[in-house]
Curated annotation (Swiss-Prot):
Superkingdom of origin: Eukaryota
Stretches assigned to coiled coil: none
Function: May be required for insulin-stimulated glucose transport and glucose transporter SLC2A4/GLUT4 translocation from intracellular glucose storage vesicle (GSV) to the plasma membrane (PM) in adipocytes. May bind phospholipid membranes in a calcium-dependent manner.
SMART domains in the cross-refs: C2 (SM00239)
InterPro entries per the UniProt record, alphabetical: C2_C2CD5 (IPR037785), C2_dom (IPR000008), C2_domain_sf (IPR035892), C2CD5 (IPR038983), C2CD5_YbjQ-like_dom (IPR056430), C2CD5_YbjQ-rel_dom (IPR056431)
Comment field on protein domains: The C2 domain binds to calcium and membrane lipids.
Cofactor note: Binds 3 Ca(2+) ions per C2 domain.
Binding site for Ca(2+) 1: 19, 26, 76, 78
Identification of the protein by name: C2 domain-containing protein 5
CDD domains registered for this protein in UniProt: C2_KIAA0528-like (cd08688)
Gene Ontology MF term list: calcium ion binding; calcium-dependent phospholipid binding
Binding annotation for Ca(2+) 3: 78, 81, 84
Composition-biased stretches (Low complexity): 293-318, 993-1006
Amino acid sequence: MPGKLKVKIVAGRHLPVMDRASDLTDAFVEVKFGNTTFKTDVYHKSLNPQWNSEWFKFEVDDEDLQDEPLQITVLDHDTYSANDAIGKVYIDIDPLLYTEAATVISGWFPIYDTIHGIRGEISVLVKVDLFNDLNRFRQSSCGVKFFCTTSIPKSYRAVVIHGFVEELVVNEDPEYQWIDRIRTPRASNEARQRLISLMSGELQRKIGLKVLEMRGNAVVGYLQCFDLEGESGLVVRAIGTACTLDKLSNPAPFAPSCNSPCKEIKEAPFIEELNPNTHSSGPSTPLKNQTYSFSPSKSFSRQSSSSDTDLSLTPKTGMGSGSAGRDGGAFKALLRQQTQSALEQREFPFFTLTSFPPTFLVHVGGVVSARSVKLLDRIHNPDEPETRDAWWAEIRQEIKSHARALGCHAVVGYSESTSICEEVCILSASGTAAVLNPKFLQEASAEGCLEQRSEETSPTPCAFCHIPYDELNMPFPANLTYCCACRKQKVPDVLFTTIDLPSDAPVIGKGCLIQARLCRLKKKSQAEANATVISSLLPFMEYELHTQLMNKLKLKGMNGLFGLRIQITVGESMLLGLASATGVYLSSLPTPGGIQIAGKTPSEGSYDQHISHMQKKINETIAKNKDLYEINPPEILEETVGSPIPEPRQRTRLLRSQSESSDEAAELDLSHGKKDAFVLEIDDTDAMEDVHSLLTDVAPPPGFYSCNTEIMPGINNWIPNIQMFSSVRVIRLNSTNLTNQTLNKNFNDLCENLLKSLYFKLRSMVPCCLCHVNFTVAVPEEESIQVAVTAVAITFDKQQALQVPKPRPEKPQPRGSDPEEQLQFPLELSSDSPGPSTFSPARDVPERGGSPAGATQRAVSLDKSSPLAESHLRHRGGGGGAIPSVTVVKMTPLSFIPGAKITKFLGIINMFFIRETTSLREEGGVSGFLHAFICEVFAMVRAHVAALGGNAVVSYIMKQCVFMENANKNQAQCLINVSGDAVIFISESEVEAGPGQPTAPGPQSAGVGGDSAT
């Protein structure tokens, strides 16, 4: 399918002075695509040139349109010497290749230079004409949509979820080529950016081809990563979930389910049932076949004789029993046959999605993870990267075997990551073992099930907590009790997952961010010796991180972790571990016991006294946390019943079934009694420090909550004011007398101080919740630690809370107990904010007002020289002309915008930037350099979205931030990779007030320690 690419250079503005004599510039533009280059005329002596060039036309194959970026270079003309480069713009053409997306790219793009940053802007028009032919899609994958969001995109429904797709491409890193010794830093950086852009396009095209082979049309949960392997080369890899998506033809009835967080799906099934079975007769059969096909088709070779048979039978039995009663024997037989064939087609039953509709998950087994330490070698043939493929295949096989051991046939919330230091690379993969509902997958879209009403009678909301494995043959030791909700099935005492909290999960109280942090020193060594040391340390680090998470979960009085993400980062002389998750109290699981400290025996009297004092403090902390997070209602009746918490909760929530099961449950629960206390044995200094770290964990200040999932469990009255921010901090360690204890303290202080600074800067948004808190840890130099965090602050309001219908009966009572602890005060923001309009995830109709400009400007210090502030004004004048009411492109890591409805997805934004400086001190040191660079990244992302006609970026993530510094030479370099989905949204408040109501301008930037707000 060849195509014609047409480019027009319109004008430039705010160009830098290149001629010192006249304080002006003689600018012209080179437009390059593939091997063809066009030039505009030179516009003499102007900082705001008006080229108005003719249309430059490139006749290229559609394969090149996907692989190659459009390169626009702005130069200053010199008569007697080489032309000076002002900067470049890379434009991805792929969004124009979708049938439903933008037809033209038109807007002002920041002109970016890797040494000087943003140097003015250029107005560009880009169009693509595609010609259909008989070989359509043979070499290209035009038309395949990519989404970063880890749930089915709003305004779409899933016809079929096909499954896991992965690909990687490798090449030599220009930074380590011999020519790099003689070329300028600018040329080296630009060569690197150009190569990464090419590899990214090639990777997307190859993944798209795999999707087309599976008869899909989209990739959801697309995660692309860059592995900078130094002299070994450069690897770009990606994973995702292939789907067949259908655009909702009449989005009006689906408004509640299209524009809200995961809790929105509570009402989605009933809305979608208004037009049932519109697609169940045709695509439904392959859907059940394809989706449930993810029961593992292959096993580890050492288990093939037994595991293959067992697991291939499991889905057939489940599907047959689930469908026979209603669909008849013939359909059941057909279903079995289709499932069996699908099982043979799929190798890895993985899903990169983290958010699902109700009843999609039948059971959740727990977190499965695998790590491997590898030695990097030079990539001899970039076209055949078998070595890297084999490495990841080993990891995925191990994940699959772990899921099987838990009695599960699929892995959801799956992700992969690497950590590289010199020749050593740690490969990591994790996910949540799960059993999926084939009936749901066959006859429903993944954003709302058509036959959910009939399905919900069999699987109760607590069903996903029930164990999927055999109680008599458990894969690991666990304390099992009967489910506190249904009293019929067994549940574990705690549940760890990598997914978001299911929308219908019974939760008591609010959630909170729980982090485990760990550092370990190691000896400096090379090659195999280094890899051996790291391999021996990894299991102990994972065990300690798990123990920390368990202790902190008990200290909060909670029993479930969601959104768990564990990072292991390797440096020359240390290993860092950071685990982040959102703790919740699941009412289906038993009440967690306390933490009991056991001292050494025999011991001195003063030591015993110290132990008892610490025990008292721990008990007080647990009680305080239960009050803070409103986890106290079930404990009221505990003493009167004589059995643990499940009995009174059953009496409160399920009166009709309490009489049937109370005797049996009491008998079973009494066997556990109050022995649930988690014993911490203090037998050395490390154990004592672990206990102290528990007690010194600082809770958020009054008015703040935090979580790393999209929405905080237990809060349903959001106000449509969001504030996204990114922050990067680097600390240098004193190498003298560095021990594990001091290293741990420094790392803990770094993370805690980072959170405290965010609370301080956002203090005027109280009551406020930090959602989607995403930490990334790196060891850029031998004696430094870098932590980057991206999150979004959302306000919530007490006044409307009483009017919002609560989806769970446990919440109304605790909400009235202590308003100060619930932090639901009237919003105190500037006049830019709207009135008391709120948005409830349960109700699902969000509203949007102005950005909280005044609030954040009071809470943060503004950097007047930041290009982001200028970009706000620039975007108002150009770029987003199709949406006159838009003043600034919103950015959020969430998959939705509170108070708004996403009407169109315009394509994926995947950008890689390099910034280098030889005057670090003059630019404000590390903080000023990082802050300015992050602001420039924000400005460039906004410009590309506005040029597509969009007004927001959702599912935004800063996937990489690699900082390197040479303080002696006053030099620094930073690499940032960001991605997200460009969208068009309509504000609910704008629809009600009419199109003439403008939105308030957004905030600009925060300026301390490399922080940025957007």
